[in-house]
């Protein structure tokens, strides 16, 4: 079982435990009644629809490939730095075992900042989408590798009903077709293969032509330099998601400024 399969399986266990505390129907009702006073519906995708490249900046304490990244995880301070530096959106890891994430991180960050947040987790059940809405998320991550096409289509519809966005993650040509058929409006190419952790930034270039221009295109992972940003701009990407590079920067605002202005 590769790491992605392990992450998905652990998500199923987490959901089963969460349902013992709050049932699916209860969570649905809470989500439907949850209103975001600061953001409009579909604020995440609206933030990515601009003439220039949009930046999704990630808050994460650890990862399976790199281990502990930020021992002193000042997540609120980091989110504040990102917003001050001009980030368009913030990605918050909530997966607790391998990424040392927490729902509370998302809840507190979403409450503090005025830009949209995406819940970065391994969605395997509709429960997690309703849960994300209650935590203040403006978007959720849906990974094609761990979902069927039917599930993907259903989950996108649930997101639509809640006024939140779905970032649909793909890794290859087959998943690109799956995402388009399911009705994805935002498609992200993960340049990191979560099955073996190899990184290939050319993956975004390879898959770009398979995605219609009316779909928001996001390049995820492996972005380290201004050269990487220039390459992403050249293929006509709408947005880039940056995690480890910013998390390891001593001055996150300066690093983001450098990348944004490249």
What are the roles of these predicted feature ranges?
Residues 7, 57, 82, 132, ...:
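Conserved, mostly hydrophobic/aromatic
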Residues 10, 60-62, 95, 122, ...:
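Active-site beta-loop-alpha junctions enriched in small/polar residues
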Residues 206-210, 233, 248-262:
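C-terminal helical cap(s) of enzyme catalytic domains, especially alpha/beta-barrels
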């Amino acid at each position: 079982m590769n790491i992605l399969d392990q992450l998905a399986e652990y998500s199923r266990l987490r959901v089963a435990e969460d349902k013992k505390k709050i049932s699916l129907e209860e969570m649905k009702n809470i989500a439907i009644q949850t209103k975001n006073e600061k953001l409009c519906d579909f604020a995440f995708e609206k933030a990515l629809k601009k003439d220039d490249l949009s930046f999704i900046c990630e808050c994460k304490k650890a990862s399976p490939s790199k281990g502990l990244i930020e021992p002193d995880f000042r997540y609120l301070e980091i989110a504040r730095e990102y917003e001050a530096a001009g980030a368009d959106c913030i990605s918050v890891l909530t997966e607790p075992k391998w990424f040392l994430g927490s729902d509370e991180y998302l809840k507190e960050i979403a409450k503090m900042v005025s830009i949209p947040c995406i819940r970065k987790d391994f969605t395997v059940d509709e429960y997690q989408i309703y849960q994300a809405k209650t935590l203040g998320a403006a978007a959720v991550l849906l990974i094609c590798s761990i979902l069927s096409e039917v599930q993907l289509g259903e989950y996108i519809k649930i997101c639509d009903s809640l006024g939140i966005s779905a970032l649909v993650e793909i890794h290859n040509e087959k998943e690109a077709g799956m995402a388009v058929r399911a009705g994805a409006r935002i498609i992200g190419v993960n340049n990191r293969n979560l099955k073996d952790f190899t990184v290939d930034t050319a993956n975004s270039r390879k898959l770009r032509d398979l995605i219609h221009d009316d779909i928001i295109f996001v390049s995820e992972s492996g972005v380290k330099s201004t050269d990487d940003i220039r390459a992403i701009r050249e293929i006509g990407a709408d947005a880039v998601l940056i995690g480890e590079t910013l998390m390891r920067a001593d001055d996150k605002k300066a690093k983001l400024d450098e990348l944004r202005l490249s």
